[in-house]
Amino acid sequence: GCRYMFGDCEKDEDCCKHLGCKRKMKYCAWDFTFT
């Protein structure tokens, strides 16, 4: 499944909807989208 906020990630696709991977810190964070 997808990674939630602050979950480990390698790329944006690893994260749940509305989350993007912060490559520098290697965690999922909100990508500023609502839809």
Swiss-Prot record:
Q: Anything further noted?
A: Negative results: shows no or weak effect on hNav1.8/SCN10A, rKv2.1/KCNB1 and hCav1.2/CACNA1C, hCav2.2/CACNA1B, alpha-7/SCN9A nAChR, alpha-3/SCN3A nAChR.
The entry's free-text remark on domains says: The presence of a 'disulfide through disulfide knot' structurally defines this protein as a knottin.
Q: In which tissues is it expressed?
A: Expressed by the venom gland.
Q: Name one GO cellular component term.
A: extracellular region
The chain's disulfide connectivity reads C2-C16, C9-C21, C15-C28
Compartment(s): Secreted
Tell me what this protein is called. Answer: Mu-theraphotoxin-Pn3b
Question: What does the record give as the function of this protein?
Answer: Gating-modifier toxin that targets voltage-gated sodium channels with a preferential activity on Nav1.7/SCN9A. On Nav1.7/SCN9A, the toxin acts by shifting the voltage-dependence of activation to more depolarized potentials, whereas it does not cause significant effect on the voltage-dependence of activation on other sodium channels. Minor effects are observed on the voltage-dependence of steady-state fast inactivation for all sodium channels tested (Nav1.1/SCN1A-Nav1.8/SCN10A).
Sorted alphabetically, which Pfam families does this protein's record hold? Toxin_12 (PF07740)
Report the family membership. Belongs to the neurotoxin 10 (Hwtx-1) family. 28 (Jztx-11) subfamily.
